[in-house]
Regions:
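A short secondary-structure junction motif
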Residues: 18, 42-46, 71
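Positively charged, polyanion-binding regions of nucleic-acid-associated proteins
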Residues: 1-28, 90-106
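DNA-recognition alpha helix
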Residues: 30-47
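Residues in the recognition helix of alpha-helical DNA-binding motifs
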Residues: 18, 64, 130-133
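Accessory, usually C-terminal, subdomains that scaffold auxiliary metal cofactors
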Residues: 69, 75-158
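A contiguous pocket-lining binding segment that forms or flanks enzyme active sites
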Residues: 49-84
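Low-complexity, glycine/alanine/valine/leucine- and proline-rich hydrophobic stretches
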Residues: 155-168
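Alpha-helix N-cap/helix-initiation sites
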Residues: 8, 12, 28-32, 54-61, ...
């Protein structure tokens, strides 16, 4: 999910502007028509270099909803409309993503607002809440007061982080 979204900006944008918005609106399903409208809006806004034909839009719309189904955000199967499934970020993913952003050189405060958290429906406050909850597992110590956040990191590199997450 994370690496697909990082390598496929269209999938990332679909998640943050369509999927999570639908969840926020209390919708029960997302269909290929929602994905098609998303793509047409992107084309109209000039976000793509070349205008796509209708068959390409249909195929990519199906790809977007299919990816969401593959990652457990939407129900599986070959459907034009799919139910939204309960989805939340898992504790190991929170730890991995926090350390990944840290090792990229992103500061503690900036990390909370990084766009990758939006892939899991989290804004800055939601991210801070999740990090505080997970800090009880001992992967890091987090302190916050107002807008200031300080994290004491326990692991020296991503390999050490992955070993700790895996329990080795």
């Amino acid at each position: 999910h994370l690496f697909t979204a990082r390598s496929q900006p269209m999938y990332r944008d679909f998640l943050t502007s369509v999927y999570w918005q639908a969840c926020s609106d209390g919708r029960l399903s997302i269909g290929n028509d929602d994905a098609s409208r998303f793509l047409l809006r992107a084309l109209d806004d000039g976000q793509m270099v070349k205008r796509w034909n209708e068959s390409t839009i249909r195929r990519v719309s199906s790809y977007l909803t299919g990816c969401c189904a593959d990652y457990g955000l939407l129900e599986p199967g070959a459907r034009r409309i799919r139910r939204i499934l309960p989805y939340g970020i898992m504790p190991p993913v929170i730890v991995y993503l926090a350390y990944d952003l840290h090792f990229q050189g992103i500061g503690d405060n900036s990390m909370l607002s990084h766009e990758d958290w939006g892939l899991y429906g989290l804004d800055r406050d939601g991210t801070l809440d999740e990090l505080k909850r997970i800090s009880r597992d001992g992967h890091f110590i987090i302190q916050s007061a107002g807008d200031a956040v300080r994290i004491a990191w326990k692991y020296a590199n991503i390999e050490e982080t992955c070993r700790a997450i895996a329990g080795r």
